[in-house]
Amino acid sequence: MSGRNAFVGAAALTAAPAQKIARGLSVVTVAQLTEFDEIVDVRSEGEFAEDHVPGALSCPVLSNEERARVGTLYKQVSPFEAKKVGAALISANIARHLQERFHDRPRDWRPLVYCWRGGSRSGALAQVLHQVGWHVGQLEGGYRAYRRQVLADLVVLPTRFQWRAVCGLTGAGKSRLLRALEACGGQVLDLEALAAHRGSVLGSLPDLPQPSQKMFESLVWNALRQFSPSRPVYVEAESKKIGVLRVPDALVAAMWASPCVVIEAPVRARVALLKAEYEHFITDPAALTAKLECLSGLYGRAVIEKWRALIDAARWDELTEDLLIRHYDPAYTRSTLKHYPSLSRAPRLRLAAATDAEFTRLAQQCLA
C-alpha cells in the first residue's frame, strides 16, 4: 500500500511545517505521512513484525542478528567499537537496498524514513537517499512517536463516527453482509479481517496467525482514518476480544452504544454458510476435534463424545446444527442482549438465499 493516497489524514492530527535539515531533507511528524509516496521502515525484521506503519516497506539497516551483535559490543566492549562495526553493517545494507529495492524509483519519488526513535538508523538511510537526489522525510521521534499517536487517536477517533452494529446469530452471514456493504460503497470496519480471526472458539484461520496487539491497533487506526464522519460506519457486533486480541476500549464503547441492524437466516441456511466458511475443519477433522475439547468444561464428556462421533461419521450438517442450538445461539444471544441495548429496536434483514445477489440486495436496503 504505497502512494500519496495510502493514508487519509485523521481529523485528530494537525500537520506542522516540516523542519528542514537541508534542501530536500526534512524532519516531519506523523501528521505528514500523507505527503510522501512511500514509508520506509529501517528497523530490524523483528521490530517490523511486531508493529509498523501500515503499508510501510521493510528495509532493515541492521538485521535482528546484526542489531544484537552491535548491542553486545556496545555493552561488553565499548560504544566506539559498536559504532564502528554498526556503521560498516549499515553501509553495506543501505548499498544493498539501493541496488535491490530503490533502483527503479523515479527522480520525483518522495520517501519517508523511520526507525525506533528517529535517530541514527533512519538518519543514515535518509542522508544517502537525499544525496542521490530524492526529497526525503525523516519521522521525528520515529516509531515511538508514531505509536504514541496511534494510542491517542484510538481514544478519540471512534467517538467521531456514526456506528451501525451488524448483529445476527452465528452463520447468518454478518461477514458476507459487511463485504456487500463495502462493495456497494458503504463504510465498513471489518475487525475480524484485521484480527485474522472469526471471533469464536473455532474462529482461528488456518495457516494465518493473528497479528500482535500493537499491529492490530495500527490496522484499526489506519482503517478509522479513512472514514468520513458524515456517513455511517458498519461494524460487526463484537465483544471486547477477537481471539487473543483486545478491541480498543473507546471503539468497544462506541459499538455497544450504537444502533443495530440484525440479519436473520433459517438454521439450514446458516449450516450451509458455516460449512462453506469453515471448510478447513471438514478437510482436517482432527483439528476440529481438538478445538471442541475446549468446551468440555461447559458441556461435559458425553456431549464432547457425541460431537466426536458426528465428526468421525462426517455428519457435518447434524454436527453444525447441534453446535448452533446448544452452544453458539445461547452464547451469542446472551452477549448481544447484554452489550447492545438497542438490539430490541433494530430493523431486521431476512436472508432469502445465501447468494451474492441476495447479500447485495440487503446491503442496498441498509444503505438506502
Question: What is each stretch, according to the model?
Answer:
Residues 1-54, 82, 151-158, 163-167:
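Flexible, polar/low-complexity N-terminal or interdomain linker segments that lie immediately upstream
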Residues 33-106:
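Positively charged, proline/Ser/Thr-rich regional signature most characteristic
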Residues 85-140:
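Catalytic cysteine-centered active loop of the rhodanese-like fold, especially the PTP/DSP P-loop
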Residues 120-121, 162-182:
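Glycine-rich phosphate-binding P-loop
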Residues 126-129, 175-187:
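A conserved segment at the C-terminal end of the G1
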Residues 134-148, 190-195:
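A short glycine-rich beta-strand->turn/loop micro-motif centered on a GG-aromatic cluster
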Residues 184-254:
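Conserved nucleotide-sensing/catalytic segment adjacent to the nucleotide-binding pocket
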Residues 254-260, 264-368:
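Conserved NTP phosphate-binding and transfer environment spanning the P-loop NTPase/kinase superfamily
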